[in-house]
Amino acid sequence: MSGFFITATDTEVGKTVVAGALAGVFRELGYNIGVYKALQSGHVASNPEGDAARLKVLSGVPIKEDEICPYSIEEPLAPRLAMKRAGRAVTLKDIIHHYNERLKEFNSLFVEGAGGLAVPYTEDALVIDFAKELQLPLIVVARPTLGTVNHTVLTIAYAKAHGLTVAGVILSGCKECEMERVQENKVMIEELSGVPVLGLLPFFEGEFTKEEVLESAKEYIMISKLEEFIRNESTVAHTSSN
């Protein structure tokens, strides 16, 4: 298996934009990349304001929103609680099944979690349990300013304690007027965590187009570094199958 698991230090940090943009860029480069978000709360999958719809638009994948996100609920709560209140039982086995179904169509998947790694996800698992099952390298999306060093370093430490590989950090929502502090935070995160910050994605104000987001990803994220992970994972998978 190859791809990335996109997590974050919190909710509303920019995971969906990062996941969709990276998938879109890699698809432009010729990779057969898909996107997957197992559980979504706050919007049903078909809602154009929801994460599944945004992932579809940004990535350009030729599948339906409910194939990107098989389990969605309107109420904006942690997925486990939202599903429980709706009387729906979703297990870790269920979401892994749908993940494997998507792998029949794509060589690699960029998987978006929900909130951070310790979020209650299915009725029997946290987000980190799902990440451990997939064993994909993590991309941690974080805020660029005050508080981000602590949140990001703790997230990385938690992931490493559970045996996960962290490919890098992307600081999302960077404003030009804050860049001096953002750069200082970048350096501090790298020093304290030992993980590279692979991008400083700008703040998108108001409505934005797919083209704007993908061009920003190409300009501000180290795509070549992430491409090395994809190639290495593919090589390992090919070697293991022989």
Curated annotation (Swiss-Prot):
Cellular component terms per the entry's GO annotation: cytosol
Entry's Gene Ontology molecular function annotations: ATP binding; dethiobiotin synthase activity; magnesium ion binding
Gene3D superfamilies found in the cross-reference section: P-loop containing nucleotide triphosphate hydrolases
Keyword Ligase included in the entry's annotation: yes
Top enzyme category: ligase
UniProt keyword terms in alphabetical order: ATP-binding, Biotin biosynthesis, Cytoplasm, Ligase, Magnesium, Metal-binding, Nucleotide-binding
Residues reported to bind substrate: 41
Residues binding Mg(2+), per UniProt: 16, 51, 112
Cofactors demanded by this protein: Mg(2+)
UniProt record, GO biological process: biotin biosynthetic process
Localization in the cell: Cytoplasm
Main location: cytoplasm
InterPro entries referenced in this protein's UniProt entry, alphabetically: DTB_synth_BioD, P-loop_NTPase
Pathway(s) annotated for this protein in UniProt: Cofactor biosynthesis; biotin biosynthesis; biotin from 7,8-diaminononanoate: step 1/2
Chain residues that bind ATP: 12-17, 51, 112-115
Reactions the enzyme catalyzes: (7R,8S)-7,8-diammoniononanoate + CO2 + ATP = (4R,5S)-dethiobiotin + ADP + phosphate + 3 H(+)
Subunit-level organization: Homodimer.
UniProt xrefs under HAMAP family: BioD (MF_00336)
Family: Belongs to the dethiobiotin synthetase family.
Function summary: Catalyzes a mechanistically unusual reaction, the ATP-dependent insertion of CO2 between the N7 and N8 nitrogen atoms of 7,8-diaminopelargonic acid (DAPA, also called 7,8-diammoniononanoate) to form a ureido ring.
Name of the molecule in the record: ATP-dependent dethiobiotin synthetase BioD
Source organism of the structure: Bacillus anthracis
Gene: bioD
